[in-house]
Amino acid sequence: MKLPIYLDYSATCPVDPRVAEKMVQYMTMDGTFGNPASRSHRYGWQAEEAVDTAREQIAALLNADPREIVFTSGATESDNLAIKGVAHFYNKQGKHIITSKTEHKAVLDTMRQLEREGFEVTYLDPESNGLIDLAKLEAAMRDDTILVSIMHVNNEIGVVQDIAAIGELCRSRKVVFHVDAAQSAGKVAIDVQEMKVDLISLSAHKAYGPKGIGALYVRRKPRIRLEAQMHGGGHERGFRSGTLPTHQIVGMGEAFRIAKEELQQDYDHALKLRNRLLDGIKDMEAVTINGDLDQRVPHNLNVSFAFVEGESLLMALKDLAVSSGSACTSASLEPSYVLRALGLNDELAHSSIRFSFGRFTTEAEIDYAIELIRVAVDKLRAMSPLWDMYKDGVDLNTVEWAHH
């Protein structure tokens, strides 16, 4: 067993060996290394052909038209292009946007930037299970609302939003609907026709592809217009200039092809591992599972261990590669804004750990993880005076702490 055990698939996945093997064929003199935009010779044509194939593979996972796929450097860029692109193109129709407080930072910080430019953003509170209440979303809509941006699967707690219902609502109100699907592509089925989504952000490295490549799905019927954020040679139908990195695109295409073929298999494997981990820790005292347990992807389990400091637990679990919060914000010691939005207090939010697993995780690794978690939590609680008070029946919420 390789230590530390990797249980942080929500941060990134290892590249599938089949993907890596394919990518290597598009880099050297022996392979297809040409520029897909070179129209005057075979090197360019072959590279363009490889890009077209990848576009088809990515579109197939979404039930989309390959012409609706725009390549970007990743989901962060896709979020920026979608949100700023719509805001700047449709600002004559209105300047109001709706999103939720539990979105990824790539969405929230893009919204903050638009607020500085004079747009008005409504941030919806999720319910305590992490899901968005449709009635609240509808109530927030106004005549000048031009865009709704809601993620499909949350990166910290793994809950799955009812995208089809939100899409139906947005379509009936003629509001553009953007979805960040970085954490759902390859984990749950996505059908852009059924879901009535206008824009979808995708990432390769959350689906066993390489880092540094992503895509934005841009609907053609009804056509969605965007203002480009990256200017240059007019690549990607003018939406996103820059030479296409053939090897990365081929990697993303192959990763999405495998994801489509093995979707059910991957899902069942993750579910088996999730249930095994849950069964191994659910009899522990004062343990909370964060987020809805039914409407969620099985690849993620976010757990709060009361009376244990999250950072200490991470250190005690040095043989497990896990995270508290998401990799994008874990450099800060602030408690997770996602968990705070669910109504968790600071202490509980601070004591949460995200376990995320995937294609290459084994049952033996989960069993070893359970053993380590139980020992570490018991050891840390044994050192905590708060745990003693809790065990003695003291309601810690009623204690008035002296500030000094």
Curated annotation (Swiss-Prot):
GO MF annotations, alphabetized: 2 iron, 2 sulfur cluster binding; cysteine desulfurase activity; metal ion binding; pyridoxal phosphate binding
Pathway: Cofactor biosynthesis; iron-sulfur cluster biosynthesis
GO cellular component: L-cysteine desulfurase complex
Catalytic reaction annotation: (sulfur carrier)-H + L-cysteine = (sulfur carrier)-SH + L-alanine
Broadest EC class assigned to this enzyme: transferase
InterPro entries: Aminotrans_V_dom, Aminotrans_V_PyrdxlP_BS, Cys_deSase_IscS, Cysteine_dSase, PyrdxlP-dep_Trfase, PyrdxlP-dep_Trfase_major, PyrdxlP-dep_Trfase_small
Alphabetically ordered keywords of this record: 2Fe-2S, Cytoplasm, Iron, Iron-sulfur, Metal-binding, Pyridoxal phosphate, Transferase
UniProt: pyridoxal 5'-phosphate binding residues: 75-76, 155, 183, 203-205, 243
Modified residues (N6-(pyridoxal phosphate)lysine): 206
UniProt keyword Metal-binding present: yes
Swiss-Prot/TrEMBL GO biological process terms: [2Fe-2S] cluster assembly
KW Membrane (keyword) present: no
Cofactor: pyridoxal 5'-phosphate
Residue sites binding [2Fe-2S] cluster per the record: 328
Main location: cytoplasm
Location within or outside the cell: Cytoplasm
Catalytic residues of the enzyme: 328 (cysteine persulfide intermediate)
EC number: 2.8.1.7
Any Pfam family: Aminotran_5
Function according to Swiss-Prot or TrEMBL: Master enzyme that delivers sulfur to a number of partners involved in Fe-S cluster assembly, tRNA modification or cofactor biosynthesis. Catalyzes the removal of elemental sulfur atoms from cysteine to produce alanine. Functions as a sulfur delivery protein for Fe-S cluster synthesis onto IscU, an Fe-S scaffold assembly protein, as well as other S acceptor proteins.
Family: Belongs to the class-V pyridoxal-phosphate-dependent aminotransferase family. NifS/IscS subfamily.
Matches recorded under PANTHER family: CYSTEINE DESULFURASE, CYSTEINE DESULFURYLASE FAMILY MEMBER
Subunit text: Homodimer. Forms a heterotetramer with IscU, interacts with other sulfur acceptors.
UniProt-recorded name of the protein: Cysteine desulfurase IscS
Source organism phylogeny: Bacteria, Pseudomonadati, Pseudomonadota, Gammaproteobacteria, Vibrionales
